[in-house]
C-alpha cells in the first residue's frame, strides 16, 4: 500500500502531487489544481449526508441540495446528477468495492424522474453515512462532500465567497439582526464589501450579499481559532455606499457648472500635445515643418561652440551622458535650452549633442544619392584647384563651423585631420546594401576622412557664400597676433581680474600673471615681433591674447595648487624652493667638483693643503661694462639693453686641471658655462610656446625666461669661452687679463 492505495501497474496521475514530487518539477502545486491524489493520513469521524431537496434554478438546471454533518458542524452543498454519478465511480475506484459497499451504481439512473431519483439518493446517502470514516483518503471524494483531511469544512478557493471580488463598499448606518443562517449581523459603523447587488423592487425588500470587512466585534472561528470573516445577506437600506453620488448636501445647493472656455481648452490641448522628436528625422521633413534650411539645434550648438568651445579636445572628448540626454529631451519637446549658459559648465556635452544629431539622421548630410558621385570626384587624379571646382558643384551647403575651429587649433589641439576623423562617420555613410551586410561600412573610412579633411582645409574656396570675418568669433592665430573677444574664453576673464593679494603669494608665476595687463599696454611689437636682437637659439611663434592668459594663469594655478596640498608636500616644495633660490643667486658659488674634493684630501688632508686648495679654488667675480664685455666675449646684441647692465662671470681654477690641459708648456683654458644677467629688470621676456599648458612651478629668486630650464641652459652659444677664443682674450689689456686669471697663471699663459 502506498498512501492508502493499492499498488498497481498504472502510473500515478500527472495531476497528483506525489507524481510531481517524484518527478523533476519542484514547483509547489495548489490543491485546487490537483485532480486526484490521496492524503497520507486522514482524521475523520462519522460523516452524515442528508438529501434535502431537488431544486431547479433559473436556467432549468436541477441542483440537488444536501446537508453534510461532520465534527459537530454542518453545511449545505449543491450538486448535479452528473456530479453524483462521477462521485459514485470515484468512490468505488479508490475506496470501496461495490460488492462490499452494496451501493447502487448511479450512472445508469441519472435519467430517472426527479422523484424517483430523489428516492434513490436518500437510500444511497443513508448507506454512505454508515461507511464513512478515516478509510476515505481520496481527495476527489472528500472534495465532493467539502471535507478536509481533519473532518472540517473545506471549500475550494474558486468556490469560496471570501475570494469573490467586491463590486462596492458601504458603511452600516442601521443595526440589523439576522433571522436566518444566511443573513449577516450588522452594527452601526461596520464596513462591508458588497459582492452581489440585486435590483430594487417596489413592493419587496431588497437584500444584498456582502463580506463583513471591518467590524466592531472581532469574529473568531471556533474551529481553527483564527480571525474569521462573515458572509451573508442584509437589507440594502441598512447601509450607505461610500462612493454614492446621491449623498445629501448639507447646504442643499447644487454646484454651478464650471464654464468651459473652448479657446483656452484647445490651446491647452495643442500645447500639451506630444511633439514629434527632431532626432532621427529627415532634414527635408524638418524643413517642411519649420521652414528653416538650417535646423535650430545646429545653429544653437555651432554658436555656443564657436563662442565658448575654443578649448582643448573639442569634439574629441565626450560630454556627460545625463547632460546630453537632458538637452536632447528639451530639443525634442520643442524647447530651446540656453546653450550659452550651459556651455560655461559643460561645453563638451554640446559638441557631443551635435555629433549625435548628425549621426542619427536617416539620410546623412552627404546624402546616399550624392555619395557615388562624391567618391568618384574625389578619387580622380587632379590637382587641388581642379578638385575644388569639381566638388563645388556637388556640395550645395556645408557649415563653415569646422573650418573656423580648425583655425584655432593651437588652442583646441584639433587640426583639420583630427576634426575629419571625428566628423567623417557622422557626415558620410555609404548607401545600405540589399543583403543587409555591414562589411562595406569599414571600406570607405579612409576616403571619408580624406574628403572631410579636404573640405575643411579648402572651405573658403569650396563654398560661394563668404562669411564676414568681422562677425566671426574665432580668429586665426597663426599668421598674425590677434585677440579673441573678451567673453570668448575663461582665460580672458581671469586676466582682467585685478585682485590685490599679499606679496607673500606673488611668486614668479603669479607676479607675471598680475602684470599681464601692463604688458599689453607696451608696444605690441615687443611681444609679437621677432627682433633680430632676441635670443636666436629659441624658436618662438606669436600667440593670441587668450593663449598668453592661459599660460600665465596655469603657472598661477600650479602655485595655488601647491598651497592647497598636504603638509608633507608643502615641506618638500619649500625645500626645493629654498634650494633653487640659493642656487640661482648671482653671488652663490657652485658646489665643488668631485675632482676638487679629491684634490683636497689627496696630499694627506693637512691644513696647509686645504688652505692652498681653497685659495686656488676661490671664485673671481668680475663686473665689467657691457661695452667691454662685448669687445672681449661677444654675446647676442640687444637693442633695448641699458648701458648700466652688468655681466657676471665665475671661473674656478683647479691644480688638478692644469696637468690635464698642459700641452707643450701652454696652458689651455677649459670651456666654462657662463650666465649673463641684466642689472635692470625693466625688460620683460616674452612668453614662449610650450608643448604642455602646465609649466613647472618656478621660484621668485631669479629673473629669467619663463621657459623652465636649468640655470646653465639659458646661455648663448656665443657666450662660452672655447679654445678658439684664446686669441681675443690674449689681446686684452694686462689689467683685464689679471681680472680674469690669477697672476701666476696669467704670466705663464701670456708669456708662452
From Swiss-Prot:
Gene expressing this chain: rrc-1
All residue ranges annotated as the Rho-GAP domain in the record: 281-463
Segments passing through the bilayer: none
Keywords associated with the record: GTPase activation, SH3 domain
Signal peptide: none
Protein name, entry field: GTPase-activating protein rrc-1
Region of interest called Disordered, as start-end residue ranges on this chain: 523-552, 582-609
MF term (GO), any: GTPase activator activity
Pfam family, one: RhoGAP
Arginine finger, annotated site positions: 316
